[in-house]
Design a protein with these regions (language model features):
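Polytopic transmembrane helical bundles with strong interfacial aromatic enrichment
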Residues: 1-126
Length: 126
């Protein structure tokens, strides 16, 4: 999987998540009653790092490839869902869809558990 397109896409998305996390942190620091943005920022920043780390572990052959990819994509998709919902609530006054943030949070938990399984599962033989 070394240098695969999917890995590069995940890393690129994680970079965008990181940038968005910093933007939301700044908005939270300078905006009135913007606590939701701080939570959105944290989720994006933490899980951008988690996605990059997971890809690195896959590339090194430390964790199961397929399960690790599920975890990495889960980090990206779920953190984006969570942060988008909180940001919409802050600026637009409504949610992305009912239970969007809790759904994103639940998917983040599942992604962390998938990473644990990927680490425990034997490496695939090439």
């Amino acid at each position: 999987m070394a240098g695969s397109r999917v890995a590069r896409i995940l890393i690129g998305l994680a970079g965008i998540m990181g940038a968005d996390g910093v933007i939301l942190a700044a908005a939270s620091a300078h905006g009135a009653d913007a606590a939701r943005l701080g939570s959105a920022s944290s989720m994006l920043l933490f899980h951008a790092c988690a996605a990059i780390g997971t890809v690195a572990l896959i590339e090194r052959g430390v964790i199961h490839v397929r399960i690790g990819m599920v975890a990495a994509w889960g980090f990206v998709i779920a953190a984006a869902l969570f942060a988008t919902d909180l940001t919409l609530r802050q600026y637009a006054g409504h949610s992305l869809f009912p239970m969007a943030a809790p759904t994103g949070g639940t998917l983040l938990i599942a992604s962390w558990l998938a990473l644990a399984v990927a680490a425990a599962w034997p490496r695939q033989v090439s």
